[in-house]
């Protein structure tokens, strides 16, 4: 009972410290939100249409029909193209400046030759490959309507479990807030104890310093769960995030052992490095790197081969690989092997806490304190 009282006392003290030292909460709030904003803005969270120019020099009925086919082409989200220029001179200028994905020209002899001219700024980028595929799709639809296509195909571009890119980024930002918050808050609180000499007082308490570590774990997990509601709410309100109560509750309950493991890692790093200026950049880089290469930015199966190989050995990638599908209702449960790993992550967190405080006490004794 006394040990539980000690853990709760440390937790209450930690909450007061975080209330006064608000800079400790800046990183787990700002880093996921900044990444979420950048991903949504840069990688098409606002829609699917690419800026292109189209010029019709034929002015024939056939060319007008093809023009309309380009303008009417669309995905299940937005139109394929955003036609921002129809003047030939301006289109060439903007294309050479890299302000257009594509310049489509219907020449004067279009009716006779049935040729169109396509000019791109960078033919090798993934965006250019995507926009050329859209052109082919549009031309196939046009030819099918004209009865000139001998083989037709039906493209299924939407699946029942599809989500908006912005919604996927929103879910990833929730998971990033959870594991980054748990790790960095634990490290910050340990560094605070070290820099303010509180660790010596804790060592002399009847329950021992390890109870302080458990109190920090409790605070880190609790606060990270609360902070994650910020990106979750923003995603629901603005990013087309579909909220599934059961799935979200399952994720929040199941991820607690992972958060304990992350808090244990934070305490271990705090015991080793001790100072904010070393701890914070290191943990932030771990979080951002995991987000990009571990399934937060895109599914691991969509990454390049080298990235997939790194993700296979980078243990933190399971946070996004396993929890994102449940969060978006792609899956409704975790497998037995996943549950076993999640449980072991919690055990590892407690083990690292023992090691961290054992290491701290040993250094204090040999340091003459």
Located regions from the model:
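Extracytoplasmic/periplasmic domains immediately adjacent to an N-terminal transmembrane anchor
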Residues: 1-164, 369
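Junction motif at the cytosolic side of a transmembrane helix
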Residues: 2-4, 45-46, 268, 272, ...
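Alpha-helical transmembrane segments and their short interhelical loops
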Residues: 209, 213-283, 288, 336-343, ...
């Amino acid at each position: 009972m006394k040990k539980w009282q000690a853990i709760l006392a440390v937790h209450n003290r930690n909450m007061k410290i975080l209330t006064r030292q608000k800079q400790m909460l800046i990183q787990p709030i700002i880093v996921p939100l900044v990444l979420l904003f950048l991903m949504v803005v840069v990688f098409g969270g606002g829609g699917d249409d690419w800026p292109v120019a189209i010029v019709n020099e034929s002015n024939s009925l056939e060319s007008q029909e093809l023009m309309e086919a380009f303008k009417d082409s669309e995905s299940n989200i937005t139109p394929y193209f955003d036609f921002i220029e129809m003047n030939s001179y301006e289109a060439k200028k903007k294309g050479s400046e890299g302000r257009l994905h594509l310049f489509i020209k219907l020449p004067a002899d279009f009716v006779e030759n049935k040729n169109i001219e396509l000019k791109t700024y960078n033919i090798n980028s993934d965006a250019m490959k995507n926009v050329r595929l859209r052109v082919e799709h549009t031309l196939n639809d046009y030819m099918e309507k004209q009865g000139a296509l001998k083989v037709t195909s039906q493209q299924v571009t939407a699946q029942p479990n599809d989500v908006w890119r912005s919604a996927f980024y929103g879910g990833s930002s929730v998971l990033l807030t959870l594991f980054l918050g748990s790790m960095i808050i634990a490290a910050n609180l340990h560094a605070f104890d070290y820099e303010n000499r509180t660790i010596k007082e804790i060592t002399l308490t009847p329950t021992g310093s390890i109870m302080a570590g458990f109190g920090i774990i409790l605070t880190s997990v609790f606060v990270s769960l609360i902070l994650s509601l910020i990106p979750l709410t923003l995603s629901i309100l603005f990013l087309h995030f579909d909220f599934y109560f059961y799935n979200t509750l399952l994720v929040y309950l199941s991820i607690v052992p992972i958060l304990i493991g992350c808090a244990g890692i934070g305490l271990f790093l705090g015991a080793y490095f001790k100072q904010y200026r070393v701890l914070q950049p290191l943990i932030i880089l771990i979080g951002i790197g995991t987000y990009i290469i571990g399934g937060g930015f895109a599914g691991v199966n969509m990454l390049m081969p080298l990235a997939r190989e790194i993700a296979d050995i980078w243990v933190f990638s399971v946070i996004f690989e396993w929890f994102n599908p449940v969060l978006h209702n792609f899956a409704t449960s975790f497998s037995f092997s996943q549950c076993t790993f999640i449980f072991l992550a919690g055990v590892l967190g407690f083990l690292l806490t023992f090691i961290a405080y054992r290491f701290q006490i040993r250094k204090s004794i040999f340091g003459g304190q």
